[in-house]
């Protein structure tokens, strides 16, 4: 009769909770910087895609309207300006201020697309931090390519 019933041990001890929280904190500490780098790479890739798309669109418009289109790159103001043969500004595209733009040659800062699909050609290097891309416009075909360096 003097026997006491056993109590089922349910729940976690304080030590188990502390160890679990420590493991979670270490995991978050390792994963968070990788997520930050990943989002920066995605942002730069999106900017480069927009940069390339401006050239592609200007080429398509030159072919469909049968008039030359020119894309002028202003690396200082991070701005692309698209004009027609009469120097009429058709549209502009602002780029991120953190994106550095370099032309391989100074004359490449202006790329002219002809109605036949050809262009004056050009090559650009776009960088943000350690992430870099090379965008080239072929002179013969007018094709625009972007490659990560």
Where are these regions (language model features)?
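Glycine-centered recognition micro-motifs in short, flexible terminal segments and loops
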Residues: 1-21
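N-terminal helix-rich module
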Residues: 1-8, 26, 30-64, 68-149
